[in-house]
Amino acid sequence: MSILLLNPIKWNDYALLDSGEGKKLERFGPYLFSRPEPQAFWSKRLPNEVWSKVAGTFLPSSSLDDNETSGKWLIKSNVLDRWEMSYDNIKFFSTPTPFRHLGFFPDQSPHWDWAAKKITNFIYNSNTETPPKILNLFGYSGLASLHAASNGASVTHIDASKKAINFAFENRDL
């Protein structure tokens, strides 16, 4: 049995640069961030001087002395609260959240591309003027919805969090 490995290929504004010792080093737009990654139990590849250039480091709640239920970011003063990024043909905002991520999940982009291919094939092979309908439950900041819509789908975007819906609207309006 072979394992199917899906790699994000349309990123200009994001890159996984290194991982190891329980962390990952990533570039989000102009900034480098270090985040916990418990499954990265190997040694780091890049030297510490590269890792020391991060704009932000996430500290999980387990590493904090206080009784916070979520972790927190240590962010350098020159980092914007949020900044614009893009993937393929969509624009969106990135922002550090108290949940370890930066407003989206770049590792999900192969799934967006898969859906875009299915949407394009449906439109090309369909005998109808009606676009394919997509229901995106747990849509969060809207990147999967925006990508599907930009490829011709009619998308219903749902999330239980009002904050997430507002974030998705802001991304849509870019």
Locations of the language-model features?
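Short, contiguous clusters of charged residues that form electrostatic/catalytic patches at enzyme active sites
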Residues: 106-113, 117, 166
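Short, Gly/Pro- and small/polar-rich lid/capping loops
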Residues: 1-15
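Generic preference for flexible, low-structure residues
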Residues: 32, 41-44, 48-50, 108-110, ...
